[in-house]
Amino acid sequence: MGNIHIQTKSKEYDVYVGKESLSHLTTIVQNMQPSVSNIMIISDEAVASLHLQTVVDALQIDQKVFSFVVPSGEKEKSFENFYAAHTSALENKLDRNSLIIALGGGMIGDLAGFVAASFMRGIRFVQVPTTLLAHDSAVGGKVAINHPLGKNMIGAFHQPEAVVYHTPFLQSLPEKEWRSGYAEVIKHALIGDVKLYHWLKEEVQTLADLRDEKLIHILMKAIPVKANIVAQDETEKGVRAHLNFGHTLGHALEKELGYGNITHGDGVAVGMLFAIFLSEQVYKVNLAYEEMKQWFLNYGYPKMPSDLSVERLVGLMKQDKKANAGTIHMVLMQEYGVVNVVSIPDETVHIALEAFQKDMVEK
């Protein structure tokens, strides 16, 4: 088991990673000042059926604990569920000394975190992630819900009190969720830890390798990449945007295909490949795109669908949060471990995306 210390301008906290990390939860709650009055656990139906009682049992405390459970799926990160969670919080008499526990993947972490950020103008919360994907979203304090016109468009920055990464919770994940989360691991390696990238290529031949000590090693290496960036730029005014590598096209694919029809990680994987494809053209460098593409395909990541409208995707990319005055801004790779936010003309993106789509179909 290991701990990773997160330090931002607004808060310091620890990420507990390992097979016994849930044992820290009671101590975390008991050490909070002022004392916690009561606890609301927010989860989804799939996770709650597997792990909710385990977390309740681990909370060896006197305070009242109740739960708010939503259906599973990215589409449930909605204003309706956000509002319903506030109603439940009020009905159960949460106050400013209450605590929210986010038990689930990235969708629940975002939803519960935004409820915590907005209820009575902000109360405390703890992240208890249950997916590999959430190694990214549970750290750093970005919380949000989706709008029909865009992903994560309504949200806030609200840091948790702690992150409890109990790795046994991940064992119930289906393969598509392992693959989805692993895309963010690859992202962290590509933008901030080249040694980790080479280790992944050697040690993770299939998704089945993401278990036990290898899993803990990956988490202990990938999370600090994000932690170091967040420490420099908590509210995404500069280098934190580098964490969006692959996300400009990735989010556009999620929106165009419909939330839940493609996992976040699959979208980001396609987005990273496109970013590398475009980076080779912009920077006139060899980033081994063909080798990278084959590596991704070997894990089962999808190709870009051939029937999608490039024009529509470019339009969605212009709605990305990094866009400025209608101009697409993408995170491009100058070399492994070195990325930059670059303004790209629509025509350049359109031509490159058409070529990328054609390449993915033909090969």
From Swiss-Prot:
Binds 1 divalent metal cation per subunit. Can use either Co(2+) or Zn(2+). Pathway: Metabolic intermediate biosynthesis; chorismate biosynthesis; chorismate from D-erythrose 4-phosphate and phosphoenolpyruvate: step 2/7. It catalyses: 7-phospho-2-dehydro-3-deoxy-D-arabino-heptonate = 3-dehydroquinate + phosphate. Its main location: cytoplasm. It is an enzyme of class 4 (lyase). Pfam families: DHQ_synthase, DHQS_C. One of its GO terms (cellular component) is cytoplasm. One of its GO terms (biological process) is aromatic amino acid family biosynthetic process. SUPFAM superfamilies: Dehydroquinate synthase-like (SSF56796). Zn(2+) binds at residues 184, 247, 264. Keywords: Amino-acid biosynthesis, Aromatic amino acid biosynthesis, Cobalt, Cytoplasm, Lyase, Metal-binding, NAD, Nucleotide-binding, Zinc. Its EC number is 4.2.3.4. NAD(+) binds at residues 72-77, 130-131, 142, 151. Its cofactor is NAD(+); Co(2+); Zn(2+). Transmembrane segments: none annotated. InterPro entries: Dehydroquinate_synthase (IPR050071), DHQ_synth_AroB (IPR016037), DHQ_synth_fam (IPR030963), DHQS/DOIS_N (IPR030960), DHQS_C (IPR056179). It is found in: Cytoplasm. Catalyzes the conversion of 3-deoxy-D-arabino-heptulosonate 7-phosphate (DAHP) to dehydroquinate (DHQ). Belongs to the sugar phosphate cyclases superfamily. Dehydroquinate synthase family. This is 3-dehydroquinate synthase. It comes from Bacillus anthracis. The gene is aroB.
